[in-house]
Amino acid sequence: MWCQRAARYVAPVLGPPHTDLMASYSVNERAIAQARRLIDARQYVLDSDWGEVQPKAAEENAFLEGHSWDDYAEWHLGLNEEANDETKSRYAFIYGDFRRVHRTGLIACQYRAAEWRHKEIELAAHELLQRLDKTST
């Protein structure tokens, strides 16, 4: 069921993976550390409609008006190795709403990373999802 929900929001946007066109992503360790801190502090949402709560461009812009690029980066599990620093295209796989971790955001990250064969990010999202589930029970 979670896979169907995630697919509803992820697949139409991304389309099928084309490995020759994919950017190279690395795991953003600072984002993982922040997500762990938020989970341990119980700053999470267990059931949300990620397609509705995922930050839109206007919300990202508003966040950047009051925060640094480093703060923005901490909400993204992936770093696009081909993009310039301090550009939105540098950061991918957002997992929260700039306040809390969303379980459905982690599921979407894991699903999308698996679909696009970004194994390290897929595993990082999986580990965070397991941590959240363990903490919330």
Spans of model-derived segments:
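A charge-rich, low-complexity, intrinsically flexible signal that marks solvent-exposed coils, linkers
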Residues: D20-T137
